[in-house]
């Protein structure tokens, strides 16, 4: 992913992507036979999560044009027992445990992270305004 820089040539931290919005995190996950690119809304306040979720819904067409299909889950329980809101796309089949599948997983992550980055460059200001 090093070959993909930001709009002004800046280095992008793909694994620890800085959204600039405390309540929003971009996350990648790889399990035995499933890999995901996620948008997590992590604010402890359910009402705040709802407002951010509704704003993402306003951008649903734009987001879905590049990251498809997307699952939209208002209450997603993470391993720690905390509830977050999650929007994600996933690929089933390629296994992180099979080296022969790594290329498919990499291409899935690359395509969707670039699409997410391009979406974020367009919409980030709206979400930053919501947080303030």
Name these PLM-found stretches.
Residues 1-5, 127, 132:
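UBC/E2-like fold recognition across ubiquitin and ubiquitin-like conjugation systems
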Residues 1-92:
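Polyanion-binding interface signature
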Residues 93-131:
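Ampiphathic alpha-helical segments that act as solvent-exposed interaction surfaces
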């Amino acid at each position: 992913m090093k070959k993909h820089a930001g709009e002004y040539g800046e280095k992008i931290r793909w694994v620890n992507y800085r959204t600039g919005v405390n309540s929003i995190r971009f996350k990648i996950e790889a399990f035995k036979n499933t890999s995901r690119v996620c948008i997590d809304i992590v604010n402890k306040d359910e009402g705040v999560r709802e407002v951010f979720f509704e704003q993402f819904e306003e951008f649903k067409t734009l987001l879905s044009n590049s990251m498809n299909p997307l699952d939209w889950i208002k209450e997603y329980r993470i391993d720690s027992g905390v509830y977050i809101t999650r929007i994600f796309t996933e690929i089933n089949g390629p296994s992180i445990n099979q080296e022969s599948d790594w290329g498919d997983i990499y291409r899935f992550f690359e395509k969707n992270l670039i699409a997410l980055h391009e979406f974020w460059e367009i919409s980030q200001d709206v979400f930053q305004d919501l947080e303030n």
